[in-house]
């Protein structure tokens, strides 16, 4: 149990630190759809897709690795709450087009990146 807790905590801390760094460095570049938040969600989508594909072909790997990467790191990196707050701010400002664009970009982009992660990992593994 403690190994699982430590794996999740370590992964989450690393993912959250990366998300914070991306926001700090990139979000001021385009406040309407902050690129740091978007990049965190896209990278997290790709990483979780690749991890799912990898762990599916390697069932003997200790479950703590899956917890560290998928539950911890990807969970700490991706951010539905920040994305939601940014969209609500756009809606409150009456910027409906930007809000719709942000929703489409984050949700569609994250789904596409997850599929890309799955397909690319399967390709690299020869599956």
UniProtKB/Swiss-Prot annotation:
- Source superkingdom: Bacteria
How would you describe this protein's topology in the membrane?
Multi-pass membrane protein
Protein's cellular compartments:
Cell inner membrane
Q: What is its main location?
A: membrane
Q: Does the keyword Cell inner membrane apply?
A: yes
Alphabetized, the UniProt keywords read: Cell inner membrane, Cell membrane, Ion channel, Ion transport, Membrane, Metal-binding, Sodium, Transmembrane, Transmembrane helix, Transport
Q: Which InterPro entries match?
A: FluC
Activity control note: Na(+) is not transported, but it plays an essential structural role and its presence is essential for fluoride channel function.
GO terms in the biological process aspect are: cellular detoxification of fluoride
Cellular component annotations (GO), alphabetically ordered: plasma membrane
Family membership noted in the UniProt record: Belongs to the fluoride channel Fluc/FEX (TC 1.A.43) family.
Q: What does this protein do?
A: Fluoride-specific ion channel. Important for reducing fluoride concentration in the cell, thus reducing its toxicity.
What name is this protein filed under? Fluoride-specific ion channel FluC
């Amino acid at each position: 149990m403690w190994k699982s807790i430590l794996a999740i905590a370590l992964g989450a801390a690393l993912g959250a630190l990366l998300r914070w760094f991306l926001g700090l460095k990139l979000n001021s570049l385009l406040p309407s759809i902050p690129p740091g938040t978007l990049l965190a969600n896209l990278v997290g989508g790709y990483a979780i897709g690749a991890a799912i594909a990898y762990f599916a072909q390697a069932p003997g790997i200790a479950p703590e690795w899956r917890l560290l990467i998928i539950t911890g790191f990807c969970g700490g990196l991706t951010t539905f709450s920040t994305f939601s707050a940014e969209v609500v701010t756009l809606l409150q400002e009456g910027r409906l087009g930007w809000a719709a664009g942000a929703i489409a970009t984050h949700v569609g982009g994250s789904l596409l990146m997850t599929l890309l992660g799955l397909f690319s990992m399967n390709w690299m593994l020869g599956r």
